[in-house]
From Swiss-Prot:
Organism encoding this protein: Protochlamydia amoebophila (strain UWE25)
Pfam family, one: Ribosomal_S13
Keywords on record: Ribonucleoprotein, Ribosomal protein, RNA-binding, rRNA-binding, tRNA-binding
Superkingdom of origin organism: Bacteria
GO biological process terms held by the UniProt record: translation
Name of the protein in its database record: Small ribosomal subunit protein uS13
Subunit architecture: Part of the 30S ribosomal subunit. Forms a loose heterodimer with protein S19. Forms two bridges to the 50S subunit in the 70S ribosome.
GO cellular component, one term: cytosol
Amino acid sequence: MPRVIGIDIPDNKRLEISLTYLYGIGRHLSNEIIVKLGLDPNMRAHKLTQDDLARLNGLLTSEYMVEGDLRRQVQNNIKRLISIHSYRGMRHRLGLPVRGQRTKTNSRTRKGRRKTVANKKK
């Protein structure tokens, strides 16, 4: 398996798909990177030469924010929202949906499992 910026990418998949295994790179960005490097998008990842891997590593570290740096930036943005007590920050802190979704029903993914409440005795 070829290693790109410290992450193993699958070697039997097309290069266009293999690059999407890196955090922060989707199909569109993957195609953009392949065009910049002048590689064939249909080529399998295990056919990359050492020179191609070096160029790919150089491009990813210099021009794009991926993997650990991107994760760190997202976490810092969320911490900043929480610290300034913005509405979005409060929703993050309370573990509720942040982008205006309804919460009377649904939103179980964000809230977690149901907490059952016992009925009052008469």
